């Protein structure tokens, strides 16, 4: 088993952390693949090539921690590549949500130009 579970969507409420600059405020850490629940069952090239995708921007997967589970929000391609290479972990930015789905420690706002 590569992942803990495979889902078609995210079960948690919209958290509002959507832009690359917001995610970059969260320090990356190692996450075990077998602890991740995916939020999509397929790898769609349109999503992969989107401007806010981790394919072009962030080097780290985006993971949401909610109600005791870790959900792989973006970076499915990175997780699959790691599994194919025989690795059991990836580095990801983990956004912690409270019970209601709000970030427990909201990332600071991006600097103004």
Give the role of each language-model region.
Residues 113:
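Feature 3881 marks metal-assisted phosphotransfer/nuclease machinery
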Residues 56-110:
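A short, basic-hydrophobic beta/loop patch
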């Amino acid at each position: 088993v590569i992942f803990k579970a495979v889902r078609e969507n995210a079960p948690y409420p919209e958290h509002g952390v959507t832009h690359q600059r917001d995610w970059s405020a969260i320090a990356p850490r190692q996450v075990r693949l077998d602890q991740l629940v995916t939020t999509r069952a397929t790898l769609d090239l349109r999503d992969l090539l989107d401007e806010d995708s981790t394919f072009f921007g962030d080097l780290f997967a985006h993971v949401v921690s909610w109600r005791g589970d870790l959900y792989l929000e973006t970076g499915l391609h990175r997780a699959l590549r790691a599994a194919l290479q025989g690795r059991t972990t990836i580095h990801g930015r983990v956004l912690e949500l409270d019970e209601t789905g709000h970030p427990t420690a909201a990332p600071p706002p991006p600097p103004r130009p």
